């Protein structure tokens, strides 16, 4: 007969009791009622927060945007093709965040910060919330350092400062992306981290931008965040916030950053699509009522930080596309009112061969000459005035055939000044080259040349001054001022090159 050993049994029971885990895990769950068009309606999830991430049974992540009395409206961060009606959903207790690190430089990622360039995983030890609050008034200081774009028309007349938000606005095919990418190219050696956010564009266009940045060595200091036209609306809506979070990471580490949103019209359309599918009431142009807040909370994150926070900066260049030049549509007026100025690109100027096609008349920088070095202020004031007078005279001269000599001279000068503002794509100029170019035009040295000769002469002049009068560039670079000494070097160089050029042309 088997003997029952009571001590052994009691030991086993004691062990079992000691191993018993009293912890109770409470999971906030719900059931899928309906799914489709990137939207899911969930029953349950009673304690979910607005903006909280939820996870579906098959792994798709969504964001709870609409909290209604009997269901929760969730936007999906994927295609959601495997989600079934009746399947369970659980709240994660987190809000959207992304990993951030220096390793992202030179990479192409999507809105969830996953690499899409086929070059392996990106290591990151820190993370940042995709939507974080903008710096407050005390955390900022006024914009005072220039951010050079390398484009004469912008740096002289519509200057951009570090920490500013300058809108680039125009019809399709007017060179908006070209202005933005040229600005990235010009940051080489300036210790500025660039983030280019492509929203709802063709994959081929994004590939073209990435290739041109790689060819010129600009990807070393650039991160590209891309959500193409075939991406879910949720990801197109999130992409700009992801870019801003990456730029903020560098800004708070006392670095200067430049972020380009290309373009916010497509983000607004993606948000409109999500809102209408969630049955939020439509407003003007069928956009939801909070579309202004969509852009304002994004653009307010651009700032020039105070000296206590390390003087880092985040400069934003949002791009907005207009329909046949209508700047008074809903999204353009919203973004104009949020930003510190706008660069307006005109299709008429573009077609007339004036490129970059910047309409100087209605473009403006609300930071103004605070974002220019002294030498640029000295030469740019005269340029603005002469171009404004030229625009007025040109309109007037169309009605009058017999003009006096002074008016004819002024028109001729204006045409040459307009010519010197033309620039090829991907050929940014240093600030010293811009100063010498503007000085040559405003002081009448180009008046004796034919309009067709102006650009050829200016290219040769820049090369000549670089090799024969390097002192000019050294003085400007060190003092940031057009001193009498620098001016004399510049005058000598222009006179010598002008004589050589005219001789060459005669021959």
UniProtKB/Swiss-Prot annotation:
PROSITE patterns: ATPASE_ALPHA_BETA. It is found in: Plastid, Chloroplast thylakoid membrane. Coiled coil: none annotated. CDD domains: ATP-synt_F1_alpha_C (cd18113), ATP-synt_F1_alpha_N (cd18116), F1-ATPase_alpha_CD (cd01132). The record marks 363 as: Required for activity. Its main location: plastid. Its EC number is 7.1.2.2. GO terms for biological process: response to cold. Pfam families: ATP-synt_ab (PF00006), ATP-synt_ab_C (PF00306), ATP-synt_ab_N (PF02874). One of its GO terms (cellular component) is chloroplast thylakoid membrane. ATP binds at residues 170-177. F-type ATPases have 2 components, CF(1) - the catalytic core - and CF(0) - the membrane proton channel. CF(1) has five subunits: alpha(3), beta(3), gamma(1), delta(1), epsilon(1). CF(0) has four main subunits: a, b, b' and c. Produces ATP from ADP in the presence of a proton gradient across the membrane. The alpha chain is a regulatory subunit. This is ATP synthase subunit alpha, chloroplastic. It comes from Arabidopsis thaliana.
